[in-house]
Amino acid sequence: MAHAAQVGLQDATSPIMEELITFHDHALMIIFLICFLVLYALFLTLTTKLTSTNISDAQEMETIWTILPAIILVLIALPSLRILYMTDEINDPSFTIKSIGHQWYWTYEYTDYGGLIFNSYMLPPLFLEPGDLRLLDVDNRVVLPVEAPVRMMITSQDVLHSWAVPTLGLKTDAIPGRLNQTTFTATRPGVYYGQCSEICGANHSFMPIVLELIPLKIFEMGPVFAL
């Protein structure tokens, strides 16, 4: 989960998030290299005393600074496309959960368990217990198993929302009249937090998402025992 004054990304809890962190580091390394080369060229330009007013032809140099950026773009695009296709891949999910965005709360439906439906509201400050997180904890958590592919079906009943849990590498828009889907496989148990990531009105900041990930054997005893 996130920590106060955190600079980097949250720890990965799914294979997709691990890939995203790796791609982030890969792209950042290329960006730092480009910045270093540009600053070095500027430094040489400002410090050298040699000047020339003659226009010279440099076909080799022009070829290099045309091909080199193309190679850099390919090095960034290929892993990016790979992750993009991974996020769209649906691998025979074991469970399906439907999430419906409202102003300003979420409704969840366990479609594999008799259509169990419940609402999830942010806990007001007066109802917070010791250890609860302000603006992040909810009255009803979504309980899901680890080490099992889960499919989220996401939509909205009023305006645009976005269902996002950073530690799982998930962010899917909730669009009225449209049903989007995403899958994930959590790799470790715990409680993980997210929020609506699409400005949806005055109380946009008060739409937290809380996932409680538990071992599969415990989940099979009753998927909503923690509610």
From Swiss-Prot:
According to its UniProt record, what is one Pfam family this protein matches? COX2_TM
Q: What is the membrane topology listed in the Swiss-Prot or TrEMBL record?
A: Multi-pass membrane protein
| SUPFAM superfamilies hit by this protein | Cupredoxins, Cytochrome c oxidase subunit II-like, transmembrane region
The alphabetical list of record keywords is: Copper, Electron transport, Magnesium, Membrane, Metal-binding, Mitochondrion, Mitochondrion inner membrane, Respiratory chain, Translocase, Transmembrane, Transmembrane helix, Transport
Record-linked CDD domains:
CcO_II_C
**Main subcellular localization, coarse class?**
mitochondrion
Assembly description: Component of the cytochrome c oxidase (complex IV, CIV), a multisubunit enzyme composed of 14 subunits. The complex is composed of a catalytic core of 3 subunits MT-CO1, MT-CO2 and MT-CO3, encoded in the mitochondrial DNA, and 11 supernumerary subunits COX4I, COX5A, COX5B, COX6A, COX6B, COX6C, COX7A, COX7B, COX7C, COX8 and NDUFA4, which are encoded in the nuclear genome.
What protein name is recorded for this chain?
Cytochrome c oxidase subunit 2
* Organism expressing this protein natively: Gorilla gorilla gorilla
Instruction: Tell me the organism's taxonomic lineage.
Output: Eukaryota, Metazoa, Chordata, Craniata, Vertebrata
Name of the encoding gene: MT-CO2
